[in-house]
Structure formats: structure tokens, C-alpha cells
Regions:
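Short helix-loop "hinge" at the ATP-lid/N-box region of the Bergerat-fold HATPase_c
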Residues: 112-113
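A conserved beta-strand-to-alpha-helix junction within the catalytic ATP-binding
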Residues: 56-71
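Conserved glycine-rich
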Residues: 118, 186-187
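Short alpha-helical segment of the dimerization/phosphotransfer core of two-component systems
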Residues: 31-36
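Conserved catalytic submotifs in the C-terminal HATPase_c
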Residues: 58, 80-92, 129
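Conserved micro-motifs of the catalytic ATP-binding
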Residues: 51-56, 93-96
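Short conserved segment of the HATPase_c
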Residues: 145-159
């Protein structure tokens, strides 16, 4: 991977005429290199989860963490991304593996960006349940998921062919990773989706001491 990136850098440093002629090719190679790096990182996350590596459970500031994630996704340059955060809890802290839970929320937000049009509306909500749990939800205005696929999308490597025009780079690991991390916390996930209108996915994490 590093060798490929170095080759791209050298190629990009060619004379102006040559660089203009090959600019599109190099940009494509660079994008594919970045995509492959992201896929490998996602695969490592899934392998780590499957190997049952112990979660690093701590008390952390989930409010600040979600605010940071929202700020990151508002800076998306490929699309117009509007992100809102509705934090309804009285406490800013929760128990869980901070890094893994933030990876989960980031995966959900990434899917919202990928599977929406040029204008993306994402709503992140966080609240307590009546059973000493924290619920985090990510809603969007994307293409939605048909009822017959709403269980299959959690399967590792599953990729829907229902919307070929919306196919995005990926290997179908995002939601299976979400499922594994939520289960590792003893939690559960829920999905509400309507084709053509959008999707809402919620994760619920127990907070029992």
C-alpha cells in the first residue's frame, strides 16, 4: 500500500503536459488506494471483534464525543451534509468501550452519507431508556432499505443490489461490525426504514453497574 502511494506521488510530480494527460488516471488510483486502506481498516475491526478481544470499558464523555463526530461529518466535501445532534440525557457520561462505540456511530453516519443524494440530512440522538440503558440513534434521508433486506444487511459481506445507481465502494462489513460491537456490550440494535425516505438505526447499551 505504501509503495502504491509512493508511485502515485512520483507520477504526480511529472512535467505539466504529462501530468495533465494522466491526471484523471492518477486521481482514480489515489481514490482506490484510499478506499482499499479504508476496507483493510474495517476488516481489521471486524476480525478484532470476532476474536473477542476484551472491550476496554470505561466511563467517558459521550456528549463531547458525539459533538466531535458531528463536527467531522459536517466537513464532508463531496456532498452537502447537514448534521444535527439532539442530546437528551441529564449526564454527559456513559459506560462502554469508547473507541468501539464511536466506531459504531461513525459507521452508521458513514452509511448515511454514502446512501443518500447530494444533500444529506443526518440526525443523531442520544437519550436514556427506562431500563438503565443509553440509546443512540442515527437517522437520515437516504434511499432506505426494503423490508426483506432489513435483516440481511447485518450479515457479514452482504451487499444489496437493489439500487445499482447508488452502489458505493465497500465490502459489506459496516453493519456486521456494528452488530458485533453492540452484542459484545450486551446491547441490542433496531432499524426503521422506508424505501425512498430514509433509515433510522438505534443502538441500546446497558449501563448496569
Amino acid at each position: 500500500m505504501q509503495t502504491l502511494k509512493m508511485c502515485v506521488s512520483v507520477f504526480s510530480a511529472q512535467k505539466t503536459d504529462e501530468k495533465d494527460e494522466n491526471a484523471l488516471i492518477m486521481e482514480t488510483v489515489r481514490e482506490e488506494s484510499d478506499n482499499l486502506t479504508a476496507y483493510l481498516a474495517k476488516l481489521r475491526e471486524v476480525i478484532r471483534a470476532e476474536e473477542h478481544i476484551p472491550l476496554q470499558i470505561t466511563s467517558f464523555d459521550i456528549h463531547a464525543a458525539l459533538q466531535n463526530l458531528v463536527a467531522v461529518y459536517r466537513k464532508n466535501r463531496q456532498k452537502e451534509v447537514n448534521v444535527s445532534l439532539d442530546y437528551q440525557r441529564t449526564s454527559n457520561r456513559m459506560m462502554g468501550d469508547r473507541d468501539q462505540l464511536l466506531n459504531v456511530v461513525s459507521n452508521l453516519m458513514e452509511n448515511s452519507v454514502k446512501y443518500s443524494g447530494d444533500i444529506v440530512n443526518i440526525h443523531v440522538a442520544c437519550r436514556d431508556t427506562e431500563k438503565e440503558e443509553v440509546m443512540i440513534s442515527v437517522s437520515d434521508n437516504g434511499i432506505g432499505i426494503s423490508p426483506d433486506e432489513q435483516q440481511r444487511v447485518w450479515t457479514k459481506f452482504y451487499r444489496s443490489n437493489a439500487y445499482p445507481d447508488m452502489m458505493q465502494p465497500g465490502i459489506g462489513l459496516g453493519l456486521s461490525f456494528v452488530d458485533m460491537i453492540v452484542k459484545a456490550h450486551g446491547g441490542r440494535k433496531m432499524m426503521q426504514s422506508e424505501v425512498g425516505k430514509g433509515t433510522r438505526i438505534s443502538i441500546v447499551i446497558p449501563q448496569h453497574s
